[in-house]
Amino acid sequence: MSKLHYIIILFLIVGQSNLFAQDSMMYNIIDEVSSERIEKDITKLVSFGTRHTLSDTISDKRGIGAARRWIKKEFEIISSECNKCLEVFYEKSYVTEGDRIVFPTWIYNVVAIQRGTKNPNRFIIMSGDIDSRISDPLNYKDDSPGANDNASGMAGTIEAARILSKYKFDNSIIYVGLSGEEQGLFGGQSLAKFAKKSGWDVIGILNNDMIGNIEGVDGVIDNRSFRIFSEPFFFNSKYS
């Protein structure tokens, strides 16, 4: 069972109060995951050359602008196939300074909200990072394909939206592509502020980072376990 399968199971556990009465639905959802679609989405994201936060925003073929517009279009296509069940929009903020910010820039997150049937203001967030970079975090011109870090996580989020949007859940699900992660977690900070301003009751967050990597630093290959990366972040003290 792949990591994406585990992620979808976790979503069901958090988002459905009567999970154990719906075993058949859970397994149907798992069976719908398509590795071919995920690979296709990763390939598409890589094709933009670089998705660096400071890269081209005008071109339709290269840079962070082209990548985020493609992701938004994919969410809109998914929504059109579920009777407009997703609210798709950009959430943006203007960043003027930072150790990895060479010039002021807009940070765009791509958001798609699937409303819950019982608790529409209770949210589970599933995110993937849009941006990529090479070893030099200030180099926004050279190619940085970022297939694993983090086209894999973004593709996983899109695939989850494709599948879960076909079903109804008690709580709302937010699928989001975050920008500015490599430059200082700017997209995540912006979404947190937006969530507070909007009065969201966030009950769970799953950020998919490098889900395409199944080989550890010790050479052990394992696609049945989670590797947890986290750091303390005191939300209330910063945004309350």
Each language-model region and where it sits:
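Alpha-helical metal-binding/catalytic segments enriched in His/Glu/Asp
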Residues: 112, 126, 130-132, 136-184
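Second-shell loop/turn segments in exported
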Residues: 24-33, 51-63, 97-101, 139-150, ...
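Bacterial Sec-dependent N-terminal signal peptides
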Residues: 1-23
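Structural recognition of the beta-strand scaffold that forms the well-ordered cores
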Residues: 29, 37-47, 54, 87-90, ...
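Extracytoplasmic/secreted proteins, especially bacterial periplasmic and envelope-associated proteins
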Residues: 25-29, 33, 37-40, 44, ...
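Metal-dependent peptidase/peptidase-like ectodomains
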Residues: 178-240
